[in-house]
A protein has these predicted regions:
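N-terminal targeting signals for export/organelle localization
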Residues: 2-96
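C-terminal cap of thioredoxin/glutaredoxin-like
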Residues: 2-7, 39-56, 60, 200-273
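Domain-level signature for proteins that mediate thiol-based redox and metal-cofactor handling
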Residues: 31-32, 119, 147, 242
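Soluble non-cytosolic domains of exported or imported proteins
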Residues: 49-53, 64, 116, 127-130, ...
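A mature extracytoplasmic/lumenal domain signature
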Residues: 75, 122, 152-154, 213, ...
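Short amphipathic alpha-helical segments at helix boundaries and their inter-helical linkers
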Residues: 81-88, 192-195, 217-230
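A short beta-strand-turn-helix
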Residues: 98-116, 140-141
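Structural alpha/beta surface segment adjacent to cysteine/selenocysteine redox centers
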Residues: 119, 124, 130-201, 205, ...
Length: 273
């Protein structure tokens, strides 16, 4: 991290910060700053422009001598911003809990009536979504009571949307998870044609598949998914949700994190799901 922003950002707020610190501490200008005639000026009497400049210079010099304080300030700011983000996320999850955890129109993997639901927003051409497919498959195989809701969220253009439509249609023939998995394990770009070929290998009825892929119902689902992502502030993939907790991206320990969250819900109950 560099401090190139210091002259601009700090100069704007340094005077106010210095005054706030001085007044908050309740000290007079006995540190060498004095009013006319050598009389100390009380903090609540205010400061002259010259005195303000002196205070600013003292604080600026101290910060330049101890730049690590700026890192500490940034750390505290990051913590506050993260706390605010989590609070906003929690409220958004609670407000949209029914759409996330009780929506039977969305395709799924695992137990249809599972006791805990994992929600994944993803795109078939998302590199990190490919990284997540094996941990999700492992979770479905290992935990026979988990329900994984797949929210098709094609943010990478028409090819992604075409693949998503075919996958959703495959769900009408009971093969959503199989095609979903095959698409994300498939080498190369995913599109409608690639999805059709993989669906054919799975023995699906291609004529019915194409009809369902382009149905008003599928179009509505994709629009609803996009709207839901917007309400939750999700603009990237993959994004996982378990109750009121989220995992953005696909960390190396994704399986362990999800298993821990699921265990927590089973032990302590749902907060929003």
């Amino acid at each position: 991290m560099t401090f190139e922003f210091f002259p601009i950002a700090l100069k704007r707020s340094l005077r106010a910060a210095a005054l706030a610190l001085a007044i908050g501490a309740g000290f007079a200008l006995s540190v060498g700053l004095s009013g006319p005639g050598g009389k100390a000026v009380a903090a609540n009497d205010g400061f002259s422009d010259g005195q303000k400049d002196q205070i600013e210079s003292i604080i600026k010099a101290y910060l330049l001598k101890n730049p690590e304080l700026m890192l500490e300030v940034q750390r505290v700011l990051d913590q506050k911003q993260e706390a605010a983000r989590q609070e906003a996320s929690g409220k958004a999850l609670a407000a949209n809990a029914a759409s996330l955890f009780k929506n039977t129109s969305m395709p799924y993997g695992g137990d249809q009536k599972g006791d805990v639901t994992v929600v994944e927003f993803f795109d078939y051409n998302c590199i990190h979504c490919r990284d997540a497919v094996e941990p999700i498959g492992k979770l479905i195989d290992a935990d026979k009571k988990v329900h994984v809701t797949f929210v098709d969220f094609p943010i990478f253009g028409k090819d992604s949307e075409g693949a998503a439509r075919v996958a959703i249609a495959a769900g009408k023939q009971g093969k959503y998870w199989e095609l979903h998995r095959d698409l994300l394990l498939h080498k190369g770009s995913n599109c409608e044609d690639a999805a059709d070929k993989l669906a054919d290998k799975l023995g699906l009825d291609i004529a019915k598949l194409k009809m369902d892929a382009n149905s008003p119902e599928t179009t509505k689902l994709l629009k609803d998914n996009s709207a839901l992502a917007g309400k939750l502030g999700i603009n990237g993939t993959p994004h996982f949700i378990v109750d009121n907790k989220v995992i953005p991206g696909a960390p190396e320990d994704l399986y362990d994190q999800l298993a821990s969250m699921i265990g927590d819900v089973r032990k302590n109950g749902c907060k929003v799901c």
